[in-house]
């Protein structure tokens, strides 16, 4: 096992010692966005950026001190592969007390664009809090509730740049039909039923829709990994309201503030570094 090559990350476990001090894995869908996130954190913290790990064609991975920045692609199968290989790597490195953060974008359920949603639980398309996988012909259900300690800490972070809420997240298997879009190649949805279903989601306490949280929380719950999903609303699905503002920085700011607080406690960053980092990110708002 010590000479095993992680197939999709293209990292050999003999090099796992490089990852022993990791405290956070910050993951998002887009490779370019995560690369830029890593570069900005490195510049503002004055911590050298590792060379890009040669992860092949599927993932990019950067290390800045105790943080890994990596893209997870689109959808549950892609993030699930990353979660498996990342966790194998960190466990082999004997990393301790690490946290996984997923940052990204979502659609709002009567929630306006620019609002940052911290997912308290991921809900499947049957409106149940389970991630279901088929192993040997048997459906295995894994709970998808968030780590309440992490969620409460994120909710309580002082922030004047944007609105932050916590609530249930609907996780779907695709972007078009399961998310009730009528502009896909296949569209057999009764338009009259869309608003009725959106109202059902709202009444169930669901505040946003995305495509990864179910697998993410199901995996992290199974292995007792501290975790949180932080997504910014790009469109309010109730009225399809959106604007041209680039909100990508919003979940990054919340993640940065949380990580800085924790790394200050770990004595892995000092107060000056934390201030520089937060100032660097918030000046873009």
Specify the residue positions occupied by each region the protein language model found.
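Metabolite-binding pocket within alpha/beta catalytic cores that recognizes anionic/polar moieties
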Residues: 1-156
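Glycine-rich beta-alpha junction loops
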Residues: 30, 107, 170-176, 215, ...
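Flexible, glycine/charged-enriched surface loops at secondary-structure junctions
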Residues: 46-52, 97, 161-168, 265-279
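Short acidic/glycine-rich loop or secondary-structure boundary segments that cap or lie
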Residues: 109-111, 125-127, 174-181, 238
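Active-site rim beta-loop-alpha module in soluble metabolic enzymes
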Residues: 143-205
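Zn-dependent metallopeptidase/amidohydrolase metal-coordination segment
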Residues: 214-248
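His/Asp/Glu-rich mid-to-C-terminal helical/loop segments that flank catalytic regions of hydrolases
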Residues: 236-285
């Amino acid at each position: 096992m010590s000479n095993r090559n992680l197939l999709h990350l293209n990292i050999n476990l003999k090099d796992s010692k490089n990852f022993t001090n990791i405290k956070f894995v910050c993951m998002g869908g887009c490779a370019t966005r995560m690369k830029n996130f890593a570069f900005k954190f490195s510049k503002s913290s004055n911590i050298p950026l590792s060379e890009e790990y040669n992860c092949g064609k599927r993932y990019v991975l950067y290390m800045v001190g105790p943080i890994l920045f990596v893209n997870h692609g689109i959808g549950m199968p892609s993030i699930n592969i990353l979660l498996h290989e990342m966790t194998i790597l960190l466990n082999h490195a004997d990393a301790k007390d690490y946290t996984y953060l997923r940052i990204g974008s979502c659609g709002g359920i009567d929630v306006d664009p620019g609002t940052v949603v911290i997912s308290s639980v991921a809900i499947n398309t049957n409106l149940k809090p389970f991630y279901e996988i088929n192993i040997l012909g048997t459906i295995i259900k894994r709970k998808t509730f968030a780590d309440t300690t992490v969620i409460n800490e994120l909710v309580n972070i002082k922030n004047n740049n944007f609105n932050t809420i916590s609530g249930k997240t609907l996780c779907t298997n695709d972007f078009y039909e399961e998310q009730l879009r009528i502009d896909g190649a296949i569209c057999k949805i009764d338009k009259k039923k869309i608003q009725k279903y959106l109202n059902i989601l709202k009444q169930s306490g669901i505040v946003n829709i995305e495509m990864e949280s179910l697998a993410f929380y199901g995996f992290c719950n199974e292995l007792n990994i501290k975790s949180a999903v932080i997504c910014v609303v790009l469109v309010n699905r109730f009225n399809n309201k959106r604007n041209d503002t680039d909100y990508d920085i919003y979940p990054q700011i919340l993640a940065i503030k949380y990580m800085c607080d924790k790394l200050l406690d770990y004595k892995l960053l000092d107060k000056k570094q934390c201030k520089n980092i937060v100032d660097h990110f918030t000046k873009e708002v």
